[in-house]
Amino acid sequence: LKVRPAGSFIQGPLPTGCALCEAGAKMVLFVTGVCHYKCFYCPISEEKRMSRDAWANERKLDWSDEKAALDAMVEEARSLNAKGTGITGGDPLYDPERTVRAIRHLKATFGPKHHVHLYTQIPFDIKWLAALQEAGLDELRFHPPDETWETPDSHPAYARLWLKAKEMEDAGLWDVGFEIPCIPGSQEQMSNLVGWLGAHKFRFINLNEMEFSETNYEAMLSRGYRIKDTETSRALDSEEVAREVMRRHAGGPTTIHFCSSPFKDRIQLKQRLSRQAERRAKPYEIATEDGTLVRGVIECPDPADMMAEIAAAFEVGAEMMEAAEGRVLIAPWLLEQFADEVPFPAYFSERYPTATELEVERIPLNEPAEDAPLPARRVPVVERELADLHKLGRPGQ
């Protein structure tokens, strides 16, 4: 058993897709929210659940204009210098045509080394295996419904599909693995599944620490599951189940990888945001160690006039400022020097380097005059909280 960062652990080699996710080098392509399984532990947000919309990380894609959607997808991948893409949902195979076209476009744009892995649960038409492989899919991850874990052979619609995909892996066409949540109390069923995978020499299985989210907590609590601690959304005893399954199958042919909830947030997501912050930072912004961007903001009725006054009075160059709707965006290290002389609200704004520019913290720098005119539109502040991380494109969700 090898201990990995943030409470994760593994026996066997780390899957390629996981290594790239750990480096923050994977874009998350959410193809569709459609899925008929209604798993009680599903953490998907209400906005995405059963929606036919697509997202590349936090960027919503309008697939009614496919070319524009594919162009936006590529732009998002470039925003983090992505070395690969994880395709998820819902279930991407509810829209296999869209999924195949997206894979082809990614490979055509970034080349064969752009690693693409895909999560799927449904027993889809076996013909799509060839289509996915020909499009360039590198890694196929099956997410079997929990009712199939105890006796996989009793569910031939699934088993046939999995074994056919394994034949293609044996022919050197791609990698095949599995991914399931560690449901407390399910160690017997999970162990049976891992034993079946080992008997057929499947490459790996990822065991995800089960988590509470805004959309699943009622269903989880009603089934008796409890939160492990007050600082995270982890389910009590989920990790212990993973350790027991690993103990039973130590030395087996199938890699068993436990991916903890803190790992997804503290390592995987943080690394991805840091890559985006580095590439998206404007001259007047500071990229932080947390993967956020900090800028100065002045709220005012006439940003162009405000910029002209600042340039004249404080000798601030044009590259250190930008006019926005009802605001001047400015280098925070410069704004700090003269914020007290500005008659309008001035503050530091910390935001995620994402398409939505989610603001996570605001630090006031002055006390503007009570009669200072304000812009008609005020920017809402969104406090930093774990629930928002589910909006930030975590692979596998």
Task: Give short role names for the model-derived ranges.
Residues 2-8, 13-65:
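Canonical Radical SAM [4Fe-4S] cluster-binding loop centered on the CxxxCxxC motif
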Residues 33, 48, 65-72, 81-85, ...:
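Conserved mixed alpha/beta catalytic, RNA-binding, or beta-rich assembly cores of soluble enzyme
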Residues 26-29, 85-87, 114-118, 140-142, ...:
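Hydrophobic faces of well-ordered beta-strands that scaffold small-molecule active sites
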Residues 160-267, 283-291:
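Conserved C-terminal portion of the radical SAM core fold
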Residues 144-149, 210-211, 349-354:
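Short, acidic/turn-prone active-site loops that include or flank metal/cofactor-
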Residues 1-9, 279-397:
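Radical SAM enzyme core and accessory elements
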Residues 52-71, 93-137, 143-157, 180-192:
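Canonical radical SAM enzyme core domain
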